[in-house]
Amino acid sequence: MLMQTSQGQSGSAHVVVMGNEKGGSGKSTTALHIAVALLKAGQRVATIDLDCRQQSFTRYINNRRAWARRTGLDLELPVHCCIKLGETMQIADNESSEFQQFMDAVSAVERTFDFIVIDTPGSDSYLMRLAHSMADTLVTPINDSFLDFDVLGTVDPATYSVTGESHYAEMVRDTRRKRRQLDGASTDWIVVRNRLSMLGSRNKQLVADGLKELSFRLGFRSIDGFAERVVYREFFPRGLTALDDLDEATLGTRPSLGHVTAREEVTSLLRQLKLPLDERGRRRAANRAEWFTQVDKPLEVHDILGA
């Protein structure tokens, strides 16, 4: 599911940031699917929610924890932190408080976890920019329309050719440049097309062509994400993902073809992200899977006698 590459030698966690200045693009849904996929691969995962107001990522994880408790299922859960909104009358004091919380959260996990998955608010803010500057992998989900394309660039209304970059795209380019100057690291920027129509259309092709043209100008990779499916909306109240067991006990309903197709989409997305896994994590995942296999089997005579 996830591509294995060499981990860096710094000993720091690989930081995956979900970023888009427009809300409703599927950042939180994509973030949890990435986190759960990494956990299932045996990686140690911490998550941070910087969307102090909406907290969709936090609610998604809390829903998952509550559903696991209610059903007795062993659902993988990351170590999670939600940054609290500053509540003073002074903007500077609020930003200082939120910054300190964020730094404390990162410091607590960066040396002992393999990955940190960060969800950012759908608006420009100091914390959002800071998270982007820390990203090893930046994932920008957009809905498959020119309304959402506008967060990255502008197009000619007659020819649909790209005419310029947006404020957000310029911010990302600036933070990536500063990151390279600071420590020589390069941020892998991936734009994920979400809510894809399952039918071909002229608009769908025009958006794809626009992203291809813009990718050369901005240096990102464009990949297909999630189609417009009811199952993704149904996952949220129970905190589930398309990677969890597709059975009635887990889903709380009978699985459908939509669940199977959604899993295929998510698996394809995660493979294309090319996130780095270490071999220790792969062994942890294999040992965990073997343990669950043995738990489901009755004890053999030689197990009882210790032979």
Residues of each region from the PLM?
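P-loop/Walker-type NTP enzyme "switch/lid" segment
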Residues: 15, 19-25, 37-116, 122, ...
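Short, hinge-like loop/turn segments at secondary-structure boundaries
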Residues: 63-67, 157-159, 241-243
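Short aromatic-enriched loop/helix-cap "lid" or pocket-rim segments at secondary-structure transitions
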Residues: 58-61, 151-154, 203-204, 235-239
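Short, flexible/disordered intra-domain loops and linkers
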Residues: 88-97, 150, 199-205, 253
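Active-site signature of alpha/beta-hydrolase-fold catalytic machinery across serine-
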Residues: 33, 37, 130
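Conserved catalytic-core segment of NTP-binding enzymes
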Residues: 41, 121-224
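C-terminal lobe/tail of nucleotide-utilizing enzymes
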Residues: 1-10, 181-307
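Hydrophobic positions on the alpha1 helix immediately C-terminal to the Walker A/P-loop
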Residues: 30
